Amino acid sequence: MSNTTNTTNKISTGNFFEDFELNQVIHHATPRTIGEGEVALYIALTGARQVLHSADTVAQSLGYNARPVDDLLAFHIAFGKTVPDISVNAVANLGYAEVRFLHPVYIGDTLSTSSTVIGLKQNSNGKSGVVYVRSVSTNQLQQPVFSWVRWVMVHKNDMNAPTPETVIPNLLDFVPNTELTVPSFLDARKFNTANTGGQYLWDDYNVGERINHPAGMTINDSDHTLATKLYQNNARLHFDDVMMKQTAFGRRLMYGGHIISLCRAL
């Protein structure tokens, strides 16, 4: 009887910089149906209190079927779909552009995401490079709900892999008004400031005006870790403390999208 063990390597280590190709289309795995539990946990982790996402009665008075899922929670979940293919081996996420919220997301909706590689640039040290992708998330009816561009620095695995042609996409400085989506059913005539707790409306604000919000929030690793798991974002730099101690950062990095959520909540 042989004691030989037949071991095969079926573990996916994710994509490294040299694995990406210009115009490559990636259909990301694990569609996600969003439920009440995600919404409740998101509030617990961020303190978000936007009334449209809190009260069915308010949302319905404005023309919605029910309260929509918080835009940023839905975005983080859609974004999380891209991580295993795009940025599980990231050095750091570098930026976002052309982010558009195209359709409300409701409890029970299922989100799926795909990405197209639109740019590549290897860094001068030859150890990493920047990948530009345009991602689109759709619901179960194939309606686009989000679209965005991001660029992320990704490690190389094979240092001898050939350098790809540098292609840096031309991106908009901001999303023009003509590209912003306002729901056709929106009816603001029944909007009531008593529901928001604030008295100021759109025409009360001025360009250049600065508002110093009184609240603050101390960020800790446990909250960040739980939130990033909620979004199913499995990038190693957010979780692997042993690995990150060997980098110039010296510690885990927080998912920047969660910081955006905390700032919005404050």
Where are these predicted regions, by residue range?
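Hot-dog-fold acyl-thioester-processing enzymes
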Residues: 2-96, 156-266
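A short acidic/small-residue loop/turn micro-motif
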Residues: 34, 120, 152-154
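Hydrophobic beta-sheet segments that form the core/acyl-binding groove
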Residues: 94-140
